[in-house]
Amino acid sequence: MPYNFEWLPFTADLHINMGILLDPISIMMLVVISTVSLMVHIYSFGYMKGEKGFQRYYAFLSLFTMSMLGLVVATNIFQMYVFWELVGVSSYLLIGFYYTKKEAIAASKKAFIVTRFADLGFLIGILIYGYYAETFSFTPAASALVAAGTMIPLALGLMFVGGAGKSAMFPLHIWLPDAMEGPTPVSALIHAATMVVAGVYLVARMFPLFIGYAPEVLHWTAYIGAFTAFYAASVACVQSDIKRVLAFSTISQIGFMIVALGVCTSINPHEGGLGYMASMFHLFTHAMFKALLFLGAGCIIHAVHSNEMSAMGGLRKYMPVTHITFLIACLAISGIWPFSGFFSKDEILTACFRFSPVMGWIMTGIAAMTAFYMFRLYYGIFWGTENKTLHAAHTPHEAPLTMTFPLLFLAAVTCVAGFIPFGNLISSNGEAYTIHLDMQVATTSIIIALLSIGLATWMYAGPKQPVADKLAHTFSRLHTAAYHRFYMDEV
């Protein structure tokens, strides 16, 4: 249901419209953005209480939300680009909110500059597309696309570069971990549910063009997504800062979404709908449980005044609501039934196995790594050895209702979202897609996830961690390299 009006006429044949496009994926994104933004606004009343610049914080938060809403309802690629850049500016302001901290200033500049390089590719792609397609619409005339030849795949490839920057795909991921210098509620909104999935939304919005005129580009996105997911999961396994664990987890999960879209190239159109639907389904479920994880991390940081797991341990008895809701989110992202991540992740794995058994097993292995590092994080925070020296200075306590209500709400959504008949709501061709759970894939993935959780329990649940310490010492070079993100910042 688009509504358009002419904004900028260039030639008799080429002009830019502004308007509102409401279709299944834009409506889904509106629900995600509005829901998470509302929870973050409520949560921030408690988290940001007493902070200098309280009004400025809410102004920036509202600007970001408006920009993201404008991006997802854009009726053409140029209008999307306008709001795309507004998202970049508002995220720069939010990441650098603590402008008296050198680290926050450096992080905001880094995010802005890295994404600007990617956005240059996006802009060039838009201009090439507009010139050869003779429109900026998402649905150009087929005759113009055929006549353009190889220029359309080039344009779409450059657009994907822009999406890779926003969605922190390797090697343009380097801005996201440092962006954790912003307030934690900002991380829940920007770096879990909205801005970082803008690249996924871009590919999904342009999906008919990718699969019809640039399948080779879509094919490569799958490999980029898979490598990104593996790289980020490897780094997440050894981080000690809880927000950075979640940051690399986000990068890895976005890789899953990109892979799901990319594997739609070599299978029949009906099966292609599986990857598309699975990607959008995982975008929705991930937004909820990752926002829950970040907000839970905010409560923990608020209680112990530190991001480091060494300052935590044994917090379950002090923070029961945060503990239970964080556990629900960890089970969801690990793909444990009946939480939402089980359903969306398994649809992605099914699509990957139908594309290639090798790709299926690679992504299953990365899913196992996800379960391991998330429960390493969970045990490090809520079990393990309590830091009594630090806790004596300020006894940990449960967060106020303004902060725990969003946790409870998002936990409830995480518990039930997997049962939404997503295939009836969103598909690549507008036709309903019936979800059939592949029992072989589901059984295999859940057994592997449980084994990974068991390994994390054995290594990290006790008061001492001799196995983890011994492994870190034995593979010290690999451990150090992973801890330093394989020196990508230095490169």
Predicted regions and their residues:
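Hydrophobic transmembrane alpha-helices and their helix-loop junctions in integral membrane proteins
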Residues: 39-80, 89-395, 413, 419
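Hydrophobic alpha-helical transmembrane segments
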Residues: 15-33, 151-163, 362-367, 437-455
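Helix-to-loop transition at the C-terminal end of transmembrane segments
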Residues: 1, 132-137, 462-467
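Extracytosolic (periplasmic/ER-lumenal) interhelical loops and adjacent juxtamembrane/interface segments
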Residues: 1-22
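Cytoplasmic/organellar membrane-interface segments at the starts of transmembrane helices
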Residues: 316-323, 377-491
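Active-site-adjacent substrate/metal-binding segments within catalytic domains
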Residues: 36
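Hydrophobic H-region at the start of alpha-helical membrane spans
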Residues: 31, 115-119, 223, 408, ...
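Short phosphate-coordinating micro-motif centered on Lys-Gly-acidic
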Residues: 85
